[in-house]
Amino acid sequence: MKRMFQFRFLLPAGALLLAMGAAIPARAQAPAPEDLSRGVARIGLMDGEVSVRRGDSGEWVAGVINAPLMTDDRVATGQNSRAEVQFDSANVLRIGGNAEIHLAVLENGRYHIEIARGTVTYRIVRQSQADIELNTPSVSARPAHEGVFRISVTEAAESEITARAGDVEVFTPQGTQWIYAGQTMMARGSASDPEFQIVNATPEDDWDRWNQGRDRALQNNNSAQYVPPGVAGTEDLDAGGTWIYVAPYGYVWRPTGVAAGWAPYRNGRWVWVNWYGWTWVSADSWGWAPYHYGRWFFDARWGWAWYPGGLGVRASWSPALVGFFGYGGGGVGVGFGFGNVGWVPLAPFERLNPWWGAAYAGGLNRGMSITNVNVTALYRNARVSNGITGMAAGDFTAGRFAGVQRVSGAQVQTAGAISGRLPLNPSIASRRFSDRAVTNVPRASANTQFYSRSGAAAGSRPAGNSPAQPGYHRFGEPGAPSQNARPAQTQPGNTVGQRQGSLQRFGEPGSSQNAPRSGWRNFGTPGSSSGGRQPYNPPQSRPSGSGSGSSAPRSAPASRPASRPAPKGDKGHK
């Protein structure tokens, strides 16, 4: 028989009163509807120096693979470094060296990214309904469908947008302009009234070829066929384990190459993330999907296996899928009467008691209940010889995870199962993804102004603007050169990447930021052919097992105008 709330150690008065009124564990809850708008991306790959500026604390921390990213986070890379940010199973952003991006809006299916400097490539791998904005200091770009879109922003805040595959619509307060596959738009000036010209696409280089290799890894994803819709990070599972059939669950995934005594939720650390609270950051190379979706179980033949859930229901992301409890003595002042905190992975169909969201925000013990139980009787995986993990509660909150260890069933025969918000306050160290010191803190870019299609003030071009520099044109000026018709196909062997007039590429030796350049104009002017170009040929790859490989880029409708005035409801800058 359960003994409800018989603490052997003194609780803070407020916690004790709350606990006495909540002796029965809360019924399992699904995340509140507003939780689903709190999108989470991840660092899926990194090489070199990668730093993250936490939007909740403002601190720069060292990036790690599988680090969760949220709205207002920034990602910066050092010299000769690169990173990949994965938003879902279809949308990824790759960041080159000496670059910085800001996740201005990150909700489920809504990704607005500001590119402060450097070169990035946004890749839509397969069909996606996501609302995507790629904002630069001058313009806002919105991809139309699957494709490959390269964007560079120079130190002088000039922008270069290249459609390698697919089409992208570019927005300004004065109107919009299409960039078709095989074209590059060069834009400069303030977000209120930028200038641009369209030229042949920049030639492919090592950055593009590296991106093509990453595309193949995403497209040749055998694991995608075994997981429900909405699960990201499955491409990492192919190299990290195998899929096996285990009744009654069906196909499940088991990791290979793990150390003896390995268990889920042991190789990594707990990090405090805004809104979601304590979030598991795995040090396993494949450790995104199996720790934020589905359940784990232990099979006598195969060992630990991950059950991704039913294929017919779209999966929702969770910061972790475990049961928390306190155990052992010495917990005075910790906040819940125990000296240690433990956790166990939830088994298939076991209920999840969320500790995050609006219901549990705003106070140390708000929405919390603790029940004295035998943990091995409460959780199936607690009966596995190495299923329980624990550590000192003080080390947990201080971000010291070297002491994480296996916990025996005998140690938790009398423990306090926690339901609701965890009574463990984060420290500054709790917001860091690793013990590594950050080595790349970029110059301040928080004051850089970006144009956003969705968040800027309606308005036409301000009166009294100064005339364009010699050789430049502004959007809407009579007689501006027209450049935005879909370019004609070129035959193999034609020269590609040639700039029109005397224009040089951004950053080319000898180019002058102030020198007059021909061909610049303003949004809203009529379009005509921009000359020859070489079409982009996406890398060939076999379809994934789920049949969700990338489709060929679609052409824009013939009736779609190359440019049009700004739609009503466009708002000003931010």
Where are the regions a protein language model picked out?
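Juxtamembrane cytosolic interface motif at the C-terminal end of transmembrane helices
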Residues: A23-P25
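Hydrophobic alpha-helical segments, especially transmembrane helices
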Residues: F7-F9, A28, P543
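Bacterial N-terminal signal peptides that target proteins for export
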Residues: K2-A13
